């Protein structure tokens, strides 16, 4: 079956595309920003500000990399809003330390995203611990590994940041 092109629609779309590409970047940004509603949040907003009024009681959310940085802050604020957080770190000790330092319901688990058997074990533990999972925040990762390292036949950073989380899901 041959593919048919509606020339009139094609010309209309190409005209819009050519006009958009001819606009200066500032004009295009103005059009896009005017189309989107303005948020009341800005660079001074805190996680508490953004989640104010959010009731997460009864929700279970797992977070990888929950022992530091954005993962830890996410766990802290989600538990503050009533969620049960499964805090996942590379070692059980790190997970326990992070989970015990926040107020609210947490469950510490460990997971090494570079070791796929560890990922499967962690996923199995999550399934045994909770009846349902409302969210998974794939926060853990590595960056700027100085030299090429292979894990399971693929580059380490790709294995940890992408494939490990894919297997976990």
PLM features per residue range, with description:
Residues 1-6, 30-33, 140:
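N-terminal secretory signal peptides
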Residues 22-41:
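N-terminal membrane-anchoring alpha-helices
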Residues 19-20, 128:
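A generic secondary-structure boundary signal that marks alpha-helix termini
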């Amino acid at each position: 079956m041959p593919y048919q092109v509606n020339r009139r629609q094609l010309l209309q779309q190409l005209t819009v595309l050519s006009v958009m590409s001819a606009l200066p970047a500032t004009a295009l940004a103005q059009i896009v920003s005017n189309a989107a509603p303005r948020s009341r949040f800005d660079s001074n907003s805190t996680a508490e500000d953004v989640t104010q009024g959010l009731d997460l009681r009864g929700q279970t959310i797992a977070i990888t990399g929950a022992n530091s940085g954005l993962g830890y802050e996410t766990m802290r604020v989600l538990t503050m809003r009533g969620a049960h957080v499964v805090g996942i770190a590379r070692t059980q000790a790190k997970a326990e330390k992070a989970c015990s330092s926040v107020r609210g319901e947490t469950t510490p688990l460990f997971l090494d995203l570079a070791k796929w058997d560890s990922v499967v074990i962690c996923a199995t533990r999550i399934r045994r611990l909770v009846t349902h999972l409302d969210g998974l925040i794939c926060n853990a990762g590595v960056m700027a590994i100085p030299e090429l390292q292979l894990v399971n036949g693929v580059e380490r950073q790709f294995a940890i940041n992408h494939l490990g989380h894919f297997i976990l899901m």
